[in-house]
A protein has these predicted regions:
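Short internal beta-strands
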Residues: 20-29, 110-112, 137
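Short, hinge-like loop/turn segments at secondary-structure boundaries
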Residues: 39-44, 70, 126-129, 153-155
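Helix-loop-strand module that forms the ligand-binding subsite of alpha/beta enzymes
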Residues: 51, 58-123, 128
Length: 181
């Protein structure tokens, strides 16, 4: 949904502030969703990334195990993409790059998009977790008392970036429950 498009754009914006090198692959459905739900153009999103690739470009450097990276975030991760990654169906650059992360034992974080979940979804998530992937459903948190949608979205962004050792000072962390006197 639109919160995912907003979240993913915010993630790229925060990564740009850290000077991290980012490589962006946008599926055709993601491109259509971005335009439909946010009004952003592909150029708006692509300019936030260091490099962008067509999902068809399986010869891109990120499709190789020799490409040096800290890992990969798939956001949003549809159940179709999740199933493709789990089964090694590397039929596009997105699933191929995720396959490379698994074979090279690199960090692979999947921000799954679906509710409710059926048994197939859960089994795919379990098997990918066993393979080393991190399933990070973008669920809102309320312990940080978000005041608006942006704060809810950024909580997920910060939790995702934490997986890569990118700890931003703007992130609100759990500090325990305040005891009433």
């Amino acid at each position: 949904g639109s919160e995912m498009c907003i979240r993913d754009r915010r993630m790229l914006e925060w990564l740009k502030k850290t000077d991290a090198e980012t490589h962006l692959v946008i599926s055709p459905w993601a491109a259509a969703t971005i335009l439909h739900e946010t009004g952003y153009t592909m150029k708006d999103v692509e300019k936030l990334a260091s490099f962008t690739y067509s999902h068809k470009d399986q010869a891109a450097r990120i499709s190789s195990g020799s490409f040096q990276t800290d890992g990969m975030i798939v956001a949003p991760c549809s159940m179709k993409t999740l199933a493709g990654i789990r089964t090694g169906m590397a039929d596009n650059l997105l699933t191929r790059s995720a396959d490379v992360m698994l074979k090279e034992r690199k960090k692979l974080v999947l921000l799954t998009r679906e509710t409710p979940l059926n048994q197939i979804h859960l089994e795919n998530m379990l098997e990918l977790t066993k393979m080393g992937a991190v399933i990070l459903p973008p669920m809102p948190a309320f312990y940080n008392h978000p005041q608006n949608l942006t704060e809810m979205v950024e909580h997920i962004v910060f939790r995702t970036l934490d997986q890569f050792g990118i700890h931003l000072s703007e992130a609100k962390r759990w500090e325990g429950m305040k005891q009433e006197k």
